[in-house]
Amino acid sequence: MSSSPSAALVAPSFEGDFSPGEAFSLEAGGVLPSPTLRYAIYGEPNAAADNVIFVAHALSGSARVADWWPRLFSDGGLLQAGDKCVIGINMLGSCYGSTGPGSIDPLTGRPYGPNFPLVSIRDVVTLQARLLDKLKIHRLKLVMGASIGGMQALEMAIQFPERVERVISIGAAPLRAMGLGLNHLQRRMIELDPAWKGGHYSPDEPPREGLALARALAVCTYKSPELFEHRFARKPDRGGEDPWASGHERGQGLSGQRFDVAGYLDYQGERFVERFDANAYLAITRTMDTWDPARGYPSAEAAFRRIQAEVMLVGISSDWLFPPDEIAELGLRLEKAGVRCEHRELVSSHGHDAFLAEPDELARLLHPYL
């Protein structure tokens, strides 16, 4: 996902690592011998530890919530300190401190690489709950997140109903065929880069081209057609390239020079490579693909009936990765299962990325609920 508008960054009051001190068995059958979760805390739990808000990050986020959602921590922001305590936890599979493909496998002494096991959303929230136990946080005032973070928020309410008071899930539902197909293509872009080397690449020589292409395609899914048309239309690249020039005399007759939208996508891909790991991208997109709250239950309704929290689902009007009608349908299914559920729609031309691109509009939408 893209970054939100700039705001002064708020530093965590505490940042550290957690390990359960034992092997962690995964839903799909794998085992992590000694997993670690990186977490960050903003503010302090009160004496009753009932003022804690857990914010689950999206695909490329980290435990440092204020770094990627800064406007929500600014003066008057939804997550501004005071009587609140906000905790962010880097999910398993990521590359920002928690155990992921780039971590050392204690059984081999080498990075997990392609041997990193499949991690489910249920695995993610189960280990997060163990961290909360360690911190003596037994009930969460609110769990909120967007995209894969919203999946975590809903799964936390299903798996640990007694410890979640409220949920806000933004732009999240089980992926349908189009989303699964797009994630597959992004993974193939990485895997077909010769530098990927079957997942055994050196951190100094990662599959840059493949990851950059995957990110560029992902950015297309995070934005809306109307935003792209408004921003780029058919303008030539702002760097001075001429897409109407033949270029055949320079061996560019087939590739040509770029339109502005192409330059933007290339830039987004190149920038992303500097801050994210390709194998982590593979791992997290698979985690996203496989989220199915009904797994292990007789039906989705049976899973949803476990939820005790009040739930707010937020769809985004121009989101075509998680279309608003899918979010509304999920809300109806939750209500049918007896869940106290509200549904809101964030009207924006920014597509799936609106939760980051329009934090003020999001705050106005959520403020009455909070």
Tell me the role of every PLM-derived stretch.
Residues M1-V52:
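Catalytic-loop region of hydrolases
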Residues G331, E335-L370:
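Catalytic active-site module of serine/aspartate enzymes centered on a nucleophile-bearing elbow/loop
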Residues G77-L132, G181, L185-H200:
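Cap/lid segment of the alpha/beta-hydrolase catalytic domain
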Residues A40-P106:
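N-terminal cap/lid subdomain of alpha/beta-hydrolase-fold enzymes
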Residues S169-R271:
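Alpha/beta-hydrolase-fold enzymes
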Residues G296-A300, P323-R333:
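Short alpha-helix in the alpha/beta-hydrolase fold that links the catalytic acid
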Residues I307, L313-G315:
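Short beta-strand/loop motif that positions the catalytic acidic residue
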Residues R139-G179:
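Conserved hydrolase catalytic core segment
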